[in-house]
Amino acid sequence: MPVKREQNLKGPALKPFFVRAAYDKITIKTRYLLCQLKKFLYICGCFKLSDMKKKESPNHLLPHYYTDLIEAGCDEAGRGCLAGSVYATAVILPPDYDNPALNDSKKLSEKRRRELRDQIVRDAVAWAVGIVTPEEIDRINILNASFLAMHRALDQLKVRPQAIIVDGNRFTPYQDLPYTTIVKGDGKYQSIAAASILAKTFRDEYMDSIAEEWPFYDWKRNKGYPTRAHREGIQKHGTSPYHRMSYNLLGSTQLEMKFED
């Protein structure tokens, strides 16, 4: 399985189609049509990243790790929670994409994350969400559940990636695709940051919805994480069907679990 080391690539700008200064002045509708054209040409392989002029990304997040490959960024949300499913997202961005606001979802406000989600969904070449339930987490453990959620997201992409980059330091191979794990990748690469934002916002909405049915655990605020209010709710009212029973729900730490590679 080929695994590529991290490189200091710069953000690309597509020169065959427009000059940047002129692009900034055109209408939103024309800009959208150009974006759709670039997506189509990228998917069809009509140009490569090496054919594009490289430029520094204003937010210092790099657009791509692999050169000349259709690349999907992956990240998960909810791994450290006591309750709820784990969500993962895979995102393929256009080859010259540059959104200065993208960052690790944990560093953004809830309002900003929702605004960025709309932009990512609009602009992405492809994106998809994978979900693993609490019952599955208890059966296979949270690490393997995180990998499974990413695989499920990749399965649902409408465009098949040629390479994968993943936030973190561990991953299980997906089909025959090359992949790279990147520690704190959601603060380094735009596609991982985009995946982080989608996974976080979709999971937060899921936790808000089940909080209506189970209001005892303060899920609207803690989203299932082990806060004092959450654990006091468990102590007073017992567990819900959404709790991960393989976790030490009332302790200060989670049960140690043997993770499989």
Regions found by a protein language model. Give the residues of each.
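Short, positively charged and aromatic/hydrophobic N-terminal segments
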Residues: 23-25, 42, 48
